[in-house]
From Swiss-Prot:
Keywords: Bacteriocin immunity. It comes from the Bacteria. This is Putative carnobacteriocin-BM1 immunity protein. The lineage of its organism: Bacteria, Bacillati, Bacillota, Bacilli, Lactobacillales. GO terms for biological process: bacteriocin immunity.
Length: 88
């Protein structure tokens, strides 16, 4: 996938996820999604170096009877995270 296509896809998924009132009401997840959206508006890929997205979506899932919007699942696959410990 070309970088610009990936950025556009991430933007669309975040926008769609934030349209969901349950997602919007989850403060931690919605703030993180807004950061991801802001990064994509600036034409950059969001790099989740703190690995915040997966735990935020997991907590959302637990709070909503293990139901997660498809947009969040697809977003997890697109957002880059570190694969290993990178040192100090």
């Amino acid at each position: 996938m070309i970088k610009d296509e990936k950025i556009n896809k991430i933007y669309a998924l975040v926008k769609s996820a934030l349209d969901n009132t349950d997602v919007k009401n989850d403060k931690k997840l919605s703030l993180l999604l807004m950061r991801i959206q802001e990064t994509s508006i600036n034409g950059e890929l969001f790099y989740d170096y703190k690995k915040e997205l997966q735990p935020a979506i997991s907590m959302y899932s637990i709070q909503h009877n293990f139901r997660v919007p498809d947009d969040l699942v697809k977003l997890l696959a697109l957002v880059q995270t570190p694969k290993a410990w990178s040192g100090f």
